Amino acid sequence: MAIIEVYQRLEQPGAVAIDRKADASPLTEADLAAHRIIVDGLRALTPEWPVLSEEDADVPLAVRSGWSRFWLVDPLDGTKEFLSRNGEFTVNIALVENHRPIIGVVHVPVTGIDYFSIASVGAWKAQSADDSGSPIRVAPRSNIPLRVVGSRSHASARLTDALHALGSHELVSMGSSLKFCVLAEGAADVYPRMGPTSEWDTAAAHAIVQGAGGDVVRLDGAPLEYNRGSGWLNPDFIAVGPRDHDWVRLFSGVS
């Protein structure tokens, strides 16, 4: 795969071109190669559905407000993790319908693992391309202490305050949409995000959490939705697994 070819070349100093986007986040040739492969493939598969990728997201709201169904792609989620070579980066593909993700695929290039889901049907984890996948579910009840998963590269003072309010907990730091995936397979209880994310960062794994029996909501308890505004930034949100806590109330003091 194009991403792994570039990843292996990172061992050689200067062998991989790295640019900076307008927001100063890194952009590599792996991002662009994966973007081309995925977008071309989806357009060939479903030519009637628009495809929007992080690397080609400059579509006016006046155009996309008419999209009832579209593909939303992050060709390389976790570019900082990719560059640090810790393996915690993913490829995210979601089908969004009426502002909600209804199909999600998260591919982990280093391990070959795939997480995928279909709304109202379920979520699965496949260990390889030859594996048809096994069902995954969120944990039936919360662990004591609570297992919280958080960002490895984007910690914030607001998250620290929120975790302090939770009391006893175990924090696992992780990159990319893998945070949602460990929640979906029952290895964590909650993923609070108090910091910037874009819709392509979350849509695919959002679908997987929901397919596994969890949910993703804003801090006011409203559903996290897609393609609603002129930009692509998400509000702060909570991804939850077990339903044995009033998670919105627990995080209500975050401001």
Q: What is each of the regions a protein language model found here?
A:
Residues 93-181, 230-255:
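Acidic beta-strand-loop-alpha-helix segment within the catalytic core
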Residues 148, 182-186, 203-210:
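Hydrophobic residues within well-ordered alpha-helices
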Residues 67-109:
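Glycine-rich active-site/cofactor-binding loop and its immediate structural neighborhood
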